[in-house]
Each structure stands twice: as structure tokens, then as C-alpha cells.
Amino acid sequence: MWSRRGLGVSRAPLHLLLGVWGPSGRTGGQRKGASLARPGRGGLASCSVGANGKRDVLFLRKTLTNTVEDIQIDNFRRKSDLGVGSPDWKNLLIDVTREDHENSQNNSKRRCKVNCETDQR
């Protein structure tokens, strides 16, 4: 998956390159008092542009996964609050949709009124 050449260092020992993600690094297994390898603190892994890039990609992937899961949980909670599964859930969902539509219509009317009062369109 990741070659040494892709990490930007061709002849460095692999354990030095992967030290940031090892058992005493960012991924767990840290002992009390042990310090994490951080950018700018020395060591090949922290200085390697490729290693920092890999860490950034892993961080972004985790962040995006958490965001998607949060959205799915929110959607599930909203459906649960509406009583999805009960006989009247479709009517409740239609009411919410209609309310959202009315809110957007009111907002656009307000914007038009403000624009007309200031002679802008």
C-alpha cells in the first residue's frame, strides 16, 4: 500500500518511518509519560512530507466517516421523533415537509421585500 519511496525517503529503516503510527505512537498502546511524535520535533517520520501526508489522509478519512455517521444518526432520530413505523408517520412527514416549504417561501418573500425597499433586485 505505502512504499518507502512514496513516503519520500528511499533508504530509511521502515521502523523509523512508521514510528508515528506504532504501538507507542498515535494509534494506541501509549504508556503513561510517553510522548507522541509530533511534526517539527525531530525524527524521520515527523520530518517526512509523505508521512505527514499519510497522517493527514487518515485524519480526514476518520473525520469524514464521523460526519457521515452523525448525519445518519440525526436522520434516524428525526424519523424516530416523527414516529416512523406508526400508521400516521407519512402524514407527519408531509406536515414537516410542508412547514419547511412554507418557511422557505416566507424567507424568499422577506428577501424580496428588503431588496425592493432598498431598490435592489
UniProtKB/Swiss-Prot annotation:
Residues 24-43, 100-121 are annotated as: Disordered. It comes from the Eukaryota. This is Uncharacterized protein encoded by LINC02872. It comes from Homo sapiens.
